[in-house]
From Swiss-Prot:
This protein's encoding gene: dadA
Cellular component terms (Gene Ontology): cytoplasm; plasma membrane
Task performed by this protein: Oxidative deamination of D-amino acids.
Domain of life: Bacteria
Binding residue positions for FAD: 3-17
Protein name: D-amino acid dehydrogenase
GO biological process: D-alanine catabolic process
Record's keyword terms, sorted: FAD, Flavoprotein, Oxidoreductase
Annotated catalysed reactions: a D-alpha-amino acid + A + H2O = a 2-oxocarboxylate + AH2 + NH4(+)
TM annotation in the entry: none
Enzyme class, UniProt record, top EC level: oxidoreductase
EC number(s) from the headed UniProt entry: 1.4.99.-
Pathway where it operates: Amino-acid degradation; D-alanine degradation; NH(3) and pyruvate from D-alanine: step 1/1
Record-stated family: Belongs to the DadA oxidoreductase family.
Length: 432
């Protein structure tokens, strides 16, 4: 089958890889000059299935009001003048109760855990290298309340069979030795030993090269004007004076998916602006071993080979990509506070990207009412974590194979008022 994939970020490229491996003739189209040039370029670098959770959580509406008056707030909102933004925020608020949070987190963890398994299989099969580490992730708590609240997420981890360790402050240095100097600032942490890290852009570029060698065609520097459709199917992609035709089409344009699908399929994917710093390491012993998540500021600090990646924050501001100095100062403040000897901050590279977010935090993966149009978008801050699983899942569905995990509650159909999902199976039962 001829398949056109729109988008060459980590989600688009993994989709291309798995579809090609399934025997399809795949073409990837992107306006950029190469893969992973936008949202996948400089994300936080963490592959953290157990920490997969929606921003829409109990208490967030009240916290958002408080954050409006804080200099280093993890979330900021500025009206962009569109009704879509208001509708999206209203939908997000409706998901901020405990029932929706647990439901959304459960399916996010399900996909993320599966994705990590797919990444391991891919790594073993191809030998792909991307400065990856399998050292786990440590979420740090600065208050007793945060430590206490961790029990809510632990229930989901236990249900999914995700190994975890709840650590008191005195034990944090056992897994991250550099934290010994700042343990007095912390109340404890939640460690997920099976989590991983890695350079998402490097992974995407190398997998794209492997995919090309396997027969995938990449059409870079090719802006897409619109999808052409008639009745219940897509019949082409208009790119300038050219119409590119295929048997099936996959939308993986991230935050730009919503506009490209206007009038075709209504999907609630909105750009969530985030920032990162990439810092050269000065003293390896003063840098993190793997990934640290600061629960207070919602910032991740990740170790690559000779660099530290500091990323996080969320701005609901539309498609604005201005680099704001106060956001850089927040990233610098957190990394200096936790790893004062780790990196040469003055030589850091400052970056911003737009994460494609749904109101419930769960990506949109699967078929649409158009028989040859498929979606793989809306992964928010977890595109790197969920990319391989989403790509394999999409390939299985499109190819008519039975996927390894339940998936109907990942489709766009879940936003219909009459949608009733099949109850997902329990993944595992063991934990430590």
């Amino acid at each position: 089958m001829r398949v056109v994939i729109l988008g060459s970020g980590v989600v688009g490229v993994t989709s291309a890889w798995y579809l090609s491996q399934a025997g399809h003739d795949v073409t990837v189209i992107d306006r950029e000059s190469g893969p992973a040039q936008e949202t996948s370029a400089a994300n936080a670098g963490q592959i953290s299935p157990g920490y997969a959770a929606p921003w829409a959580a109990p208490g967030v509406p009240l916290k958002a009001i408080k954050w409006m008056f804080q200099r280093h707030a993890p979330l900021a909102v500025r009206l962009d003048g569109t009704p879509f933004q208001l509708k999206w925020m209203w939908q997000m608020l409706r998901n901020c109760d405990t029932r929706h949070y647990m439901e959304n987190k459960g399916r996010m963890v399900r996909l993320a855990e599966y994705s990590r398994d797919c990444l391991k299989t891919l790594r073993a099969a191809t030998g792909i290298e991307y400065e990856g580490r399998q050292g786990g992730t440590l979420q740090l708590f600065r208050t007793a309340q945060q430590y206490e609240n961790a029990t809510r997420d632990i229930a989901v981890l236990e249900d999914a069979g995700v190994p975890y360790q709840l650590l008191e402050a005195s034990r944090l240095a056992e897994v991250e030795p550099a934290l010994a100097e700042v343990a007095h600032k912390l109340t404890g942490g939640l460690r997920l030993p099976n989590d991983e890290t890695g350079d998402c852009q490097l992974f995407t570029q190398r997998l794209a090269r492997m995919a090309e060698q396997a027969g995938v065609t990449f059409r870079f520097n090719t802006p897409v004007e619109k999808l052409l459709y008639e009745n219940d199917q897509i019949y082409g992609v208009k790119c300038a004076d050219e119409i590119i035709k295929a048997d099936a089409y996959v939308m993986a344009f991230g935050s730009y998916s919503t506009a490209m699908l206007k009038g075709i399929v209504d999907i609630p994917v909105y750009p969530l602006k985030g920032y990162s710093l990439t810092i050269p390491i000065v003293e390896p012993d003063g840098a993190p071993v793997s990934t640290i998540l600061d629960e207070t500021y919602k910032i991740a600090i990740t170790r690559f080979d000779k660099r530290i990646r500091v990323g996080g924050m969320a701005e609901i501001v539309g498609f604005n990509t201005d680099l704001l100095q106060p956001r850089r100062e927040t990233l610098e403040m957190v990394v200096r506070d936790l790893f004062p000897r780790g990196g040469h901050i003055e030589q850091a590279t400052f970056w911003t990207g737009l994460r494609p977010m749904t109101p419930d935090g769960t990506p949109v993966v699967g078929r649409t009412r158009y028989k040859n149009l498929w979606l793989n978008t809306g992964h928010g801050t977890l595109g790197w974590t969920m990319a391989c699983g989403s790509g394999q899942l999409l390939s299985d569905i499109l190819s008519g194979r039975t996927p390894a995990i339940p998936y109907d509650d990942l489709s766009v159909a879940r936003y219909r008022s009459d949608f009733t999902p099949t109850r997902p199976q329990r993944l595992h039962s063991a934990h430590n």
